[in-house]
A protein has these predicted regions:
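C-terminal subdomains that position terminal phosphate/3'-OH groups for nucleotidyl transfer/ligation
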Residues: 189-196, 200-339
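Basic- and aromatic-enriched surface patches that contact anionic nucleotides/nucleic acids
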Residues: 10-215, 306-309, 313
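N- or domain-start disorder-to-order transition segments that initiate the globular core
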Residues: 1-8
């Protein structure tokens, strides 16, 4: 069924796959036990062509199991079936699974009077259907409810290889299984990081909580002209490439009193990206001084660490003044190397 072109599994407002093999296995166990499974919701976009509004995780879990993409694990009641694929199950058990079905609720195309109304309806239904299940991240909600041109640009830019390497994310060219091992990927944090870069260019308007600030910016940015979107795409890619050329994969690592951490930090990312974007016209001079910049990035300990041990980049304080202070740290540092 899912191999046909009648079912669109990943409409733009859907989130990415998030279920691990244990959750997939428990779903299959429900079918074995004949436990009722909630219906899936479909939207008929054309005659007999359906978008999956709710039920992506269930449908892909069933599909993957039939295709032999995972074996059962951590079953609660049928533990003797652990480590078995569909083909290795007893014939009677396979037959029981084959007889089960998922009920579906279909919103017909004529429910909405226009494409815009249909898009809005689908997004609202998606939000309400997911409000009682697994909690969506802020970016997953944005992807569903604010999926305009700018959101699509953020998704595109999040595929930049060097951006992903600096964030220790699997590359888009890797297998789906590898991608789904990354929690940041599953929760669309990579896309939110791109959004942060553009939103923080307007730091003077920063308000708390940060999620609201990002929401408000995305609403406005979805109305940007195509020319503006093209310019922003170029700015992001050029900034990422410049930073990668100078720092490599360690660009966004957090400084500590004794060493540099092993994990990238949003506070460092925000500040480094803003400072380099602001100074992108001095790219040649910055590259000429790359070795010194790389080796002295966190040299000024008096600014980085206060007398009581607080770290400028520890992320405990994210009000406008703190964010601007962190950006200014790198801006001031770079000014010495652009002449």
């Amino acid at each position: 069924m899912l191999d046909s072109k009648k079912y669109i599994l990943n409409p733009e407002y859907q989130r990415r796959k998030r279920w691990d093999n244990t959750r997939k296995s428990r779903l299959i166990e429900s079918f074995i036990m004949n436990v009722p499974v909630p219906p899936i919701f479909l939207y008929e976009i054309d005659y007999s062509i359906y978008e999956v509004m709710d039920g992506l995780q269930r449908l892909t879990s069933i599909y993957d199991f039939y295709k032999g993409k995972f074996v059962l694990e951590n079953l609660e009641y049928w533990k003797e079936l652990n480590n078995r694929s569909y083909d290795n199950l007893p014939e009677q058990v396979r037959g029981g699974i084959d007889r089960r079905y998922l009920s579906s609720i279909i919103l017909l195309q004529e429910t909405a009077k226009s494409k815009e109304e249909a898009d809005y309806l689908k997004q609202i239904v998606f939000e309400r259907l997911n409000s009682g299940g697994e909690k969506l991240t802020a970016q997953e909600t944005r992807n569903a409810l604010l999926n305009g041109k700018f959101n699509k640009l953020c998704i595109k830019l999040a595929k930049n290889d060097h951006f992903r390497q600096m964030w220790q994310l699997p590359l888009e060219s890797e297998s789906e299984e590898k991608l789904l091992e990354s929690e940041r990927y599953r929760k669309m944090e990579d896309v939110e990081l791109v959004l942060r870069f553009f939103a923080y260019r307007h730091v003077d308007y920063l308000v708390s909580p940060i999620d609201r600030f990002l929401d408000d910016y995305l609403k406005q940015a979805n109305d940007y002209l195509d020319e503006t979107l093209n310019n922003l795409e170029i700015l992001f890619n050029h900034t990422v490439e410049l930073i990668y050329q100078i720092f490599g994969e360690s660009a966004f690592l957090l400084p500590t009193n004794e060493r540099v951490s092993k994990s990238p930090s949003k506070t460092v990312y925000d500040s480094v990206m803003q400072a380099f974007a602001f100074n992108i016209i001095y790219k040649d001079n910055l590259l000429k001084n790359a070795k010194f910049i790389r080796e002295n990035k966190y040299k000024d300990k008096n600014i980085l660490f206060s007398s009581d041990g607080k770290n400028l980049f520890d992320g405990r304080n994210n009000n406008r003044a703190d964010v601007k202070s962190r950006i200014e740290y790198f801006n001031s540092f770079l000014k010495h190397h652009i002449s």
